Amino acid sequence: MAWSEIDEASRTWRIPAQRSKNGKAHLVHLSDPVWEIIQSLPRTSSLVFATSGGRNFQDFKKAKAALDRASGVTDWWLHDLRRTVVSGMARLGVPPHVADKILNHRSGTISGVAAVYQRHEFLAERKQALDAWSTHVAGVISGIKNTQKQI
């Protein structure tokens, strides 16, 4: 994530097509807690999350090992976080086609003629879903359980 990819006015991160899995540029809404974290970071490099040498962070194996030690949970993969988020969003009432757009998937939930003609990006719906997820995570962290659907 580069600072130049962040739009402060809209609080979004534009992932360039050359770095996305499906080759399409992707716009990600940055919820309030995420925005606060990003704004608290020093701008010592062109990258938002950089090593102390200012280079792109790449040692995910080492980071996962640290998370394993801290949590005591070891039987998981980083990719499981995507499944957890999408499953949690479903419980919050986020429609599958919106979750697909959040993950930048080519929609598996819209098929046939609709898949050919449907070009709406669901930006407002994605923002609402990510804000709802952010509220849910904050509740988990604080211990305050919110069981109501948010979308």
Region spans (language model):
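C-terminal secondary-structure termini that scaffold catalytic or DNA-interacting sites
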Residues: 20-21, 34, 40-45, 51-55, ...
